[in-house]
């Protein structure tokens, strides 16, 4: 019998996940705060609610009686997940994991205090005055992030005391949900940022994908590439950390575990209990199973015998540059002209500056120069021109 999966949050990552589980014969109810979100376009049914409204969430769970609930975003009343688990509904990866990882405070304290992992020095602040004090304690430069946000929203780097007030205002405008508190992190002098996609299984060992390198701008990923070449010692340390934190959080699924690589070691940064935006590079066929196919198998309790690197690849985001509706895309012929190139348009009905509307992918042989693949992906992303009905 097919299972009914309720997807909470229906963006581009959710869309690829829905496609993966549909290929395995499952039914999906896609939920978001607006209609015609990307994942809703490929799901069996859809619901439009405020997912921070616990009563609205309870109502659609009672209506559809899902076997599995898969959260894709942070702005959800996640404490309701414990009740759903008691009702016999599988929450992915688990209610505990969803509650911890939707809030940067919970996951950072688990990593640094409970598990003793190496992280950046950090403090919390719930007001502008507390932020001034926290910055004084961790030092400059530092990074200010809302406890709940996504795609870099509300995140900024503070390099002088004069920037503190603007950082607070920006954090409040970019937060998800109703939590005003921020985390203030000392800047780590890293040379590389990586995502280690980690797969925990119901009936199998924890597996790791080849590391993915990425570059951030405005707190959001711009390009990613796989494999990211790091030392065997750093890879082993990252895998050990990822294994510890996912074991502590419990559950089955894919996790995007982010690290800073610095001269003095590996620093745990963040963790997402779901497919990761930097992992869209796996859509270029870099692995035998994409991150979305891995998540689908793990969620459904299906075996993942191994994860094999098949080729090198890179991704580059296609961003909107203005506000508008009903976007259309020109330049696809030029962007797809080179061998190994691919484009994914997400299907978002509304655009705004810096909103991610698609991704350009490039792949090559295993030994290919990933820097060159990255340059090609960026060039192809720039060839895609977005038109829209502009709003005033």
Swiss-Prot record:
Residues of the ATP-grasp domain:
109-300
Q: Which PROSITE patterns did the record assign? A: ATP_GRASP
Tree of life domain = Bacteria
Q: In which pathway does it act?
A: Purine metabolism; IMP biosynthesis via de novo pathway; N(2)-formyl-N(1)-(5-phospho-D-ribosyl)glycinamide from N(1)-(5-phospho-D-ribosyl)glycinamide (formate route): step 1/1
Q: Which biological processes are named by the entry's GO terms?
A: 'de novo' IMP biosynthetic process
State the family it belongs to. Answer: Belongs to the PurK/PurT family.
Q: What is this protein called?
A: Formate-dependent phosphoribosylglycinamide formyltransferase
Source taxonomy lineage?
Answer: Bacteria, Pseudomonadati, Chlorobiota, Chlorobiia, Chlorobiales
Gene name of this polypeptide: purT
């Amino acid at each position: 019998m097919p299972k009914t999966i309720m997807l909470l949050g229906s963006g581009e990552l959710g869309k690829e996940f829905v496609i993966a589980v549909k290929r395995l014969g499952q039914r999906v109810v896609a939920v978001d705060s607006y209609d015609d979100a990307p994942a809703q376009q490929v799901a069996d049914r859809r619901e439009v609610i405020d997912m921070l409204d616990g009563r609205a969430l309870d109502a659609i769970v009672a209506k559809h009686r899902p076997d599995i609930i898969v959260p894709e975003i942070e702005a959800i009343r996640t404490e309701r997940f414990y009740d759903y688990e008691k009702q016999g509904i599988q929450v992915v990866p688990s209610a505990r994991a969803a509650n911890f990882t939707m809030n940067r405070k919970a996951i950072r304290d688990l990593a640094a205090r409970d598990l003793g992992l190496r992280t950046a020095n950090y403090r919390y602040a719930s007001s502008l005055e507390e932020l001034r004090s926290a910055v004084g304690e961790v030092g400059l430069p530092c990074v200010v992030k809302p406890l709940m946000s996504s795609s870099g929203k509300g995140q900024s780097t503070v390099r002088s005391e004069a920037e503190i007030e603007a950082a607070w205002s920006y954090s409040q405008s970019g937060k998800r949900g109703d939590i005003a508190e921020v985390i203030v992190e000392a800047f780590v002098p890293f040379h590389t940022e990586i995502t280690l996609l980690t797969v925990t299984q119901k009936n199998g060992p924890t597996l790791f994908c080849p590391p993915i390198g990425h570059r951030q701008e405005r707190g959001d990923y711009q390009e990613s590439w796989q494999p990211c070449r790091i030392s065997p010692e750093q890879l082993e340390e990252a895998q050990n950390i990822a294994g510890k934190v996912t074991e502590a959080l419990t559950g089955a699924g894919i996790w995007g575990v982010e690290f800073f690589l610095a001269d003095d070691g590996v620093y745990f940064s963040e963790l997402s209990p779901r497919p990761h935006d930097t992992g869209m590079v796996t859509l270029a066929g870099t692995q035998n199973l994409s991150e979305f196919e891995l998540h689908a198998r793990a969620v459904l309790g299906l075996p993942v015998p191994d994860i094999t690197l098949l080729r090198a690849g890179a991704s580059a985001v296609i961003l909107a540059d203005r506000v508008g509706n009903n976007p259309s895309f020109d330049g696809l012929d030029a962007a797809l002209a080179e061998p190994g190139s691919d484009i994914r348009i997400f299907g978002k009905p509304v655009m705004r500056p810096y909103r991610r509307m698609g991704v350009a992918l490039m792949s090559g042989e295993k030994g290919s120069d990933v820097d060159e693949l990255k340059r090609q992906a960026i060039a192809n992303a720039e060839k895609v021109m977005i038109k829209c009905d502009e709003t005033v």
